[in-house]
A protein has these predicted regions:
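An active-site-proximal "capping" alpha-helix that borders the catalytic cofactor pocket
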Residues: 288-304
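Beta1-alpha1 glycine-rich phosphate/pyrophosphate-binding loop at the start
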Residues: 4-73, 145-146, 157-183, 190, ...
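A Rossmann-like FAD-binding core segment of flavoenzymes
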Residues: 70-89, 93-96, 101-104, 165-262, ...
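Phosphate-coordination loops involved in phosphoryl transfer and adenosine-cofactor binding
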Residues: 3-5, 79, 143-145, 200, ...
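Residue-level detector of alpha-helix initiation sites
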Residues: 12-13, 36, 113-115, 154-155, ...
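Glycine/small-residue-rich loop that forms an oxyanion/phosphate-binding "nest" at active or ligand-binding sites
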Residues: 77-143
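FAD-site-proximal beta/loop scaffold in flavoenzymes
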Residues: 119, 124-141, 237-283, 292, ...
């Protein structure tokens, strides 16, 4: 059976940053890219808030850069999906989807989190072309334009108020006849003049053409449908961490995110570390994920030094 010092699962900013640091520490990391090579960023058309790219860069191009850097220092990047981790003893036995098994002295989980979508075909069609699940990431591109936010909780209200500072008009599409957000967030929304809350509305279809989103068709709870022209459509109905692999093996919080020891990447299982959105329900930013990937690699290196 193949044996490795450090196995990294996930190929977003957290995974590849962990790989860069682990490789430079002579841990000869093996990284499995998973179901979505490059992570969520590959669906982002333009990134302007990651340090080092003053002119901006596409998500795919940035992830290609990170991948090349990790490979340059000796990371073994592999295509494949990890199907199981036996955490009962160390080295951990990790099973790949092709049936191969690997013994890993340390494992870094960087499998990310996925935004929840409505499930509309048109929504997926325009993903990255006007449909987004991150106002902080993409709102800047819709300055002085009309946009919509779907959701009724704190996140949706935060996204709407943020977009209102950039956009001409923000429509907050709420399925229920009330907001679920905190009182303070509700007041902020209702006191922002360019936010219009559309209660008891559902999204029937995202409209667009070859250039991207052009509008949305809404359906009231009474069945009436109508269209609104807009340029951006933001989902704020939550995220779910990609933790199916470690459910029942690592401590997870009530939302399913991996619990780490404060200030570290250490999980409830010695020798397994977590980085990026899989353990971060709050920030979900590429730069934060990259930083946590660095922390995970350093923690793994120190763990190996202490367990020689």
């Amino acid at each position: 059976m193949e044996s490795v010092k450090c196995l990294i699962i996930g190929s977003g900013p957290a995974g590849f940053t962990a790989a860069i640091y682990a490789a430079r520490a002579s841990l000869a990391p093996v990284l499995y890219e998973g179901i979505e090579p490059g992570g969520q960023l590959t669906t982002t058309t333009e990134i302007e808030n990651f340090p080092g790219y003053p002119e901006g860069i596409t998500g795919k191009a940035m992830m290609d850069d990170l991948r090349r850097q990790a490979v340059r220092f000796g990371t073994d990047v592999r295509t494949g999906i990890i199907g199981n981790i036996d955490t009962s003893k160390r080295p951990f036995v990790v099973t790949v989807d092709n049936g191969n098994q690997i013994e890993a002295q340390t494992v870094i989980i960087a499998t990310g989190a996925s935004a929840k979508y409505l499930g509309l075909p048109s929504e997926q069609k325009f993903k990255g072309m006007g449909v987004s699940a991150c106002a902080t990431c993409d709102g800047f591109f819709y300055r002085k334009q009309d946009v919509a936010v779907v959701g009724g909780g704190d996140t949706a209200c935060e996204e709407a108020t943020y977009l209102a500072s950039l956009c001409r008009q923000v429509y907050l599409i709420v399925r229920k006849p009330f907001l679920r957000a905190s009182k303070a967030m509700q007041e902020r929304v209702f006191n922002t003049p360019n936010i219009k809350v559309l209660f008891e509305h559902n999204t029937a279809e995202v409209l667009g053409d070859e250039d991207g989103v052009t509008g949305v068709r809404l359906r009231k709870n009474d069945g009436e449908e109508y269209e609104i022209p807009l340029s951006g459509f933001f989902l704020a109905i939550g995220h779910h961490p990609n933790t199916e692999l470690v459910a029942g093996k690592l401590a997870l919080d009530e939302q399913g995110y991996i619990v780490t020891v404060a200030g570290t990447s250490k999980t409830s299982c010695e020798g397994i570390f977590a980085a990026g959105d899989v353990c971060d329900p709050h920030y979900r930013q590429a730069i934060v994920a990259a930083g946590s990937g660095c922390i995970a690699a350093l923690d793994a290196e120190r763990f190996l030094q202490a367990h020689k």
